[in-house]
Amino acid sequence: MAEEFVQQRLANNKVTIFVKYTCPFCRNALDILNKFSFKRGAYEIVDIKEFKPENELRDYFEQITGGKTVPRIFFGKTSIGGYSDLLEIDNMDALGDILSSIGVLRTC
């Protein structure tokens, strides 16, 4: 069930972030991503509270990404990791270029 839940969301979006809104790292990751203007349907925020039991979902994250924690951030079906990974990409001023290269940003 966890695999289906995750894979359905990854199939429909180019940038997907799995969060828990009470998590400060999740809020920080959302702040970084929300600096950008995404095309409609190219960005999805998934609250992991939507899935029960949560530990099954976290176990699946560990299986496919090596980490159980949130946020779990995907560009397409590729995991870029969590908040610290996103922050590192952003601090290198590479995030905008990456998002542009995968075609998820508005051009206007």
UniProtKB/Swiss-Prot annotation:
Its main location: virion. Residues 3-106 form the Glutaredoxin domain. Induction: Expressed in the intermediate phase of the viral replicative cycle. This is Glutaredoxin-1. Keywords: Disulfide bond, Electron transport, Redox-active center, Transport, Virion. InterPro entries: GLR_AS (IPR011767), GLRX1 (IPR047185), Glutaredoxin (IPR002109), Glutaredoxin_euk/vir (IPR011899), Glutaredoxin_subgr (IPR014025), Thioredoxin-like_sf (IPR036249). Pfam families: Glutaredoxin. Coiled coil: none annotated. Has thioltransferase and dehydroascorbate reductase activities. Gene3D superfamilies: Glutaredoxin. GO terms for cellular component: virion component.
